[in-house]
Amino acid sequence: MKKINLLVALVCLCVGNAFAGSPEIIEKYVTPTRVMWTSDQSGKYVKNADILTEPFSGQVAVNDNHCVVMKSDDSHTASLLIDFGKEMHAGLKIFAGIRPDNKPVSIRVTYGESVTEAMSQIARDGKKNPTNDHAMREFTIQLPWLGSATTGFSGFRFARIDLLDKNVELDLRAVQAIHRFRDYDYLGTFKCDNERLNKIWSTAAYTVQENMQEYIWDGIKRDRLVWLGDLNPEILTICNVFGPQAFDLVHKALDFGSTGYPLPQWQNGMPSYSLWWIINQYDLFMYEGNLPYLKAQLPYIKGLVEQVAQNIDPKTGREKIKGGFLDWPTSPDSVVVHAGMQALCIMTFDAAKNIGTYTGDQALVQRCEQLIKLLRKHRPDHHKNTQASSLYVLSGLSKDAKKDAQNIINNGMDQYSTFYGYYATEALARTGHYQQALDDISKYWGAMLDLGATTFWEDLTYKFVANAGRIDEFVPEGKYDIHADGGDFCYKGLRLSLAHGWASGPAIYLTQNVLGVRPVEPGCKTIKVTPHLGNLNWAEGTFPTPQGIVKIKVTKDANGKAVPQVEAPAGVKVVYE
C-alpha cells in the first residue's frame, strides 16, 4: 500500500511540475466566422459548408446528421477554406459524424496566416516558400468514425481541409480552433479620439499576448524561439500592458538567455542580443523594482560588460565586435551596422551603469562610465540610415540630434522596419517630433491593418503596400501578394511571420508619449507624466504598477496644451514636466 501511495504521489508531482510556471495558459474553442471557399459550388462534392460557422456543443452524437458532406473521386478532391476571424496560436479539433462506413478517413489540413498560405502546399508551391519550419502547418491525418482528431499548434487564421480518400463520404460535423494563450488581464489600456490609433495599440498588445506561451517567443508560427534582442519591445509592451502578473514570465525568458548561453557565449549566438539582454534587465527593473532578482544577475552582467569591453579599441573607442546585427534590412550594410553597434554599446553600458547604481556596485558604475567616455570618442558615419540615426539619438551619440531625427523623417516609410520602427518613433519623440511619430505609426502599422492584419508582422516593406492585395482575401490578378511575393533574408515569401512580437512598438509609444507615463524610480514608485497629444483632442488609459493601477486622462486647455488628470494608488508618486 505504501508503494502504491508513493507511486501516486510521484505521478501527481510529475503532473504538477509539467504545468509549473504556466498556470495562466488556457485553451478556448473558437468557431469559424466564415467559409471562404469550397472546391465545388454544385453541392455534388461539398454540401452545407456553412454549418461549420454555427455554434457546436463539442460533442458528436449518433443521431446528429447536421453535417457538412464532403465527397472525393478520381476527378475531384473535395476541399474547403475556413476563416477564424483573427490570427491566433492554436491547433484544430475536427469532428466527424456518423456514416455507414466506419473506416478512418484521410484528410489534409493546411494552416495559413494568410489566405494564400492556407491555399499553398509545400510540394506544389515551393516558389512561394511555404514551410513546416519550427511548427507544422501542413498535416495529413485520419479522422475516426463518429469522433474527433486534433492537429498541432502554430500561428494561423485560416485553415484548408482536403478530403484525400477517394470514393468515400465524409460527414464533417464541426471544425474548431483550440486557441491557446495566457489569460492575462489588460491592466494597461489606451484610448483616444483616433480609432485607427486605438486599433493599432490593441493589435500590438494582442500580438505580444499571443507570443507569451511557455516562454516569450518571437513569433507563433516561427521561430517560436526566445530571441533576446527581439524581447526588448516585447518586454516593454508587457510592462505597459500586462504589468506585474507577467513579470515571472519575463524573468523566465531573461534567465533562458543567461543560463542557456554562459559566458563567453553570445546570447543566441549574436553579440547585439547579449547587449539587449543587459538593457532588458534595466528596463524590467524600472517597472518591477525587484532588487534581489537584479542583484542575482550581477555576476553575469559584470562578466558580460568586460567581454564587450574587450571588443572596444582602447585608443580610438571604436567597437570591433564581430557579427554585429541591428535588424535584417540593415544587415547588408556593414557601415550602418557598425554605427548602430557603436550606439548600442553606449546604451548597454548606460543601462549597466544604472544597474550598478541601484545595486550599490560602485566599481561597475565607474567601469561603465569609463567605457561610455571611450565609446563617445568614435562617431562613425551612419549613412543617414533610419535605424542607426535612431540609436544615435537614443544613446546620445548624435553630434546633432535634430539632424539625426530629420534623417528619419526624410527617409520616410521606406527605411522603417517593424522591429526598429519603435526606436525610430522614440527618437522622433526625444527630439520633439511627436506628431510626426503619430503620423508614422498610423501610416506604417496602419498599413498592415488596411491589408487585413489582426496581428503585426515580422516585416513590412512599405513600397509594396500601394499595390498589395489583402491577406484575408484571394489576391486579385495584377495585385501584389504581400505575403507570398514579399519578404527577404530569413523571411522570404510565406515563411514570413505575420504575428511577430518585435512589431509591438506602438503599444509602448502611445502609452509612454501620448499618455506620457514612464517610471523614473524602480518599481514605479515614482512615475513621470508628460503627455503629448499632437493633433489628438484627448486620450485616456491605465498604467499597471506593482502598487496598483494608475488612471490617466489627458485633455487640451484653451491654448491647446495637454492637461493630464492622474489617479495613482498609494505608494506611487506622480511628477509632471
Placement of each model-derived feature along the sequence:
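Alpha-helical repeat scaffolds
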Residues: 401-410
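Repeat-solenoid scaffold signature
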Residues: 412-451
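Non-catalytic C-terminal accessory modules of carbohydrate-active enzymes
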Residues: 24, 44-45, 118, 370, ...
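Extracellular/oxidizing-compartment recognition motifs
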Residues: 21-214, 230, 244-249, 254, ...
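Bacterial Sec-dependent N-terminal signal peptides
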Residues: 1-21
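Beta-rich accessory regions
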Residues: 21-109, 354-379, 433, 520-577
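Active-site acid/base region of carbohydrate-active enzymes
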Residues: 117, 158, 169-170, 174-203, ...
